[in-house]
């Protein structure tokens, strides 16, 4: 699994691989001090979690307990820097509801713009998807 972070306040980006299947490794990989990020299955055929944050505490972390999770069918083209129309709508909805950030999850992690093509993939769920859905739902509001 590969995790990529968007630029933080200092303009730095981050990317690294996580090989352990433990939830603690996933939690460590999702560094919420970055305002955006995404977890991918190498070579980015599957996207497991995408996040955006906009409301932060004085120490730079997202407001605790103020991140919501959206669950869609399958991811499209959004990544840690560029949203797609669905992610943009979810960001706007989360802001309107008063959240300080959001996670985007999907029932199937395979990245495909056409759901019919996604269904033909031999492994549309991805090996880390269920574990990461449980983890993110446990830390969201």
Predicted segment positions?
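Alpha-helix C-cap/termination motif
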Residues: 96-97, 139
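Short connector loops at secondary-structure junctions
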Residues: 100-116
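Glycine/proline-rich loop-helix segments at beta-alpha junctions forming the active-site rim
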Residues: 2-10, 20, 32-33, 112, ...
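Short catalytic helix/loop segments, enriched in acidic residues and glycine
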Residues: 87-95
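Amphipathic coiled-coil/heptad-repeat helices and related helical stalk/stem segments
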Residues: 86-87, 129
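Active-site and ligand/interface coordination hotspots across diverse enzymes
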Residues: 2-84
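Charged/polar, solvent-exposed surface patches and flexible loops
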Residues: 52, 92, 131-135
């Amino acid at each position: 699994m590969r995790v990529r972070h968007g630029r933080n306040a200092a303009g730095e980006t981050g990317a690294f691989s996580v090989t352990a299947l433990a939830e603690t490794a996933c939690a460590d990989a999702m560094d919420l001090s970055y305002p955006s990020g995404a977890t991918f299955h190498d070579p980015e055929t599957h996207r497991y979690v995408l996040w955006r944050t906009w409301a932060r505490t004085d120490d730079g972390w997202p407001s605790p307990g103020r991140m919501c999770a959206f669950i869609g069918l399958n991811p499209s083209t959004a990544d840690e820097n560029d949203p797609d129309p669905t992610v943009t709508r979810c960001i706007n909805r989360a802001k309107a509801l008063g959240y300080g950030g959001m996670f985007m999850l999907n029932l199937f992690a395979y990245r495909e713009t056409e759901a019919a093509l996604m269904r033909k993939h031999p492994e549309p769920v991805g090996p880390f998807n269920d574990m990461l859905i449980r983890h993110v739902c446990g830390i969201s509001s």
